[in-house]
């Protein structure tokens, strides 16, 4: 059976520097989590990203880091965002990656995000372990 871990941010003032994701919906949680026992890899990564569409154009980068990552940090593109043309527009995307990132059970891991241009975003990252 697969195990999933998710982290999110709402209204994050994202910048070109990586920021840890330390929420799960409305709850504040630790950005770092322990890789579950009896798993050996991250099999998929899902990223949902949205902005208000009022003039923000950027690409996002999600990083998985920590001493659980056997081959070092992994960075994934979130997909690009662009202006929708009105202040009431919306912009969102979803990407999913099939991966085989080796992890060390019992060690720690975290998700963080950076953007190519500063932007106010909502983001959810989910990793599936097996």
Residue ranges of each PLM-predicted region?
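C-terminal interaction-tip segments
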Residues: 1-28, 32, 36-38, 52, ...
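Tight coil/turn sites that cap or link beta-strands
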Residues: 26, 38, 87, 106-108
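Short, surface-exposed beta-strand/strand-loop-strand elements in extracellular ectodomains
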Residues: 55-72, 125
